[in-house]
Amino acid sequence: MGASVSSDITNTITCNLQEASNTILNNQNLNDHQGIFVNIIKIGDGNINANNFAEKSNASIDINALANALNNSSMNEDLNKKIAQTAKAAIKGVNLMQLGDANTTINDIVNTSIKVKNTAIQNLIIRFDQKIKINIYHIGKGNIKVKNVHLKEIHKIITKEVENAKNNNKDVTKLIEQFSQATESKVEGFSLKILSLIIFSTAFLGLGGVYVGGKIAFPVTLLLSILAFYQYFNWTDRTIFTDGFVDTMFNIDNDGCEALKNLTIENVKSAKGASDRCLKNPKCVAYNWNHNTKKITMFKGVLEEGCKNDILKNNTNETLFERKKLIVREGKKDPIMSTNGDLYLNNKNQTLWYNYKKKKQNNWKELKNEKKIILDNSIKQGIDKFIKIIFGYEEKLPGPMPHTLYIDYSHNNHLKVFLCKLNFLIGKDFKNRDQSKDWTLISTIHLDIKMLDFEENDSCGVIVEQNKLWLLCVAVILLFIGIIGMGLGLKKNKN
């Protein structure tokens, strides 16, 4: 797992730097030889539309200038956001619970990736004072439009610098060790303690040899065994396992969670602070943290395995790192300028609004063309309004859900609004319907959808009391020695 994380960090940074480099190059409108990054040699008149070229061109790309452009504040901020999302997505499918505190683990991966990226860019600026030559053939005058450039040489240089930066970063090494250890079962000091006990038993108590002090030593050994058993069941290491970006949270009404009782509700500013708060409270066995209210709900009592496993099963990592920050409001009036959010549903007249923000101000616009579609569909289904909005991805459209709008938010700059148009809800017509037409795309809303930040997500966690395995082994060995020794003593007394 450690090697996989190392590879993920390299791929995450390289791909995002490559994409940013391509964006910079592809946005250049170059006149003659005045391009900052690309100098293209041409002869004669006419425009060049260099579309999708890779090697059939005659140009030079200034690596140093490109690296400086990557390093400017706006580009760097955008890169950091993309790297953060890619880094999180890179470990989807990993059971974060086995890594302990997911809040810390995710932040460590993101921060380390950004550090490596910064080092790689600085190295590009310092080391490279060269231009990469490519060839393009053109005769005539005119402008040159560069589009969809993808150069293998740039990719090689970026990959090399990212690898160098990663290999010299101590935080990467720590992450690799952390992920590697998560898959190993490790008992500190186990071998030495068992070995010491065996040596003590055979040498001092005389097992297999001379019986020395058995009348006192072996009863004491049995008492020590009982003490070791007691310590094994009562002396535990208290650790917390957390998960972020969760849909399903702990609730005393959940199946299997009936043994939990509400302990306390407190204000906590961050997900990390919430997990620390529960860990420090000796009565806390599980917690939920709500990012909207900034409150932690702690639970006491017995945490059944069924309850814990059900929460873990429902909080899968398939899409949790890809979620967008989409705020939906509902009300019985149309939204006003001060209403914040991305989408607004007027439940009274069944209208859907979207907020195209300009200059950081709210600007609400109604999807007027869709109002009639929604109303007509609702009337046909015998209701006066649609009931709910759900969110997901277009390729994962659910089964028929009458009276529902489905919002696909998987795209970076727009939403797709689907309506479940079931006109036949009973009988043969429903069974024999064309299921591909259950959902109809009624609108595409162009919005700048922000990615979720880690602290803008709900999280939950459980306390795990881990027994010390070496104590159990000590108890068993002491019990064995005590019983055998007492038996030898009784036999000797009879003789």
Curated annotation (Swiss-Prot):
The chain crosses the membrane at residues 194-214, 216-236, 469-489. Its main location: membrane. A lipid is attached at residue 2 (N-myristoyl glycine). One of its GO terms (cellular component) is membrane. Residues 150-182 form a coiled coil. It is found in: Membrane. Keywords: Coiled coil, Glycoprotein, Lipoprotein, Membrane, Myristate, Transmembrane, Transmembrane helix. Glycans are attached at residues 58, 71-72, 103, 111, 262, 314, 317, 349, 457. It is a multi-pass membrane protein. The keyword DNA damage does not apply. Belongs to the IIV-6 118L/458R family. This is Putative myristoylated membrane protein 458R. The lineage of its organism: Viruses, Varidnaviria, Bamfordvirae, Nucleocytoviricota, Megaviricetes.
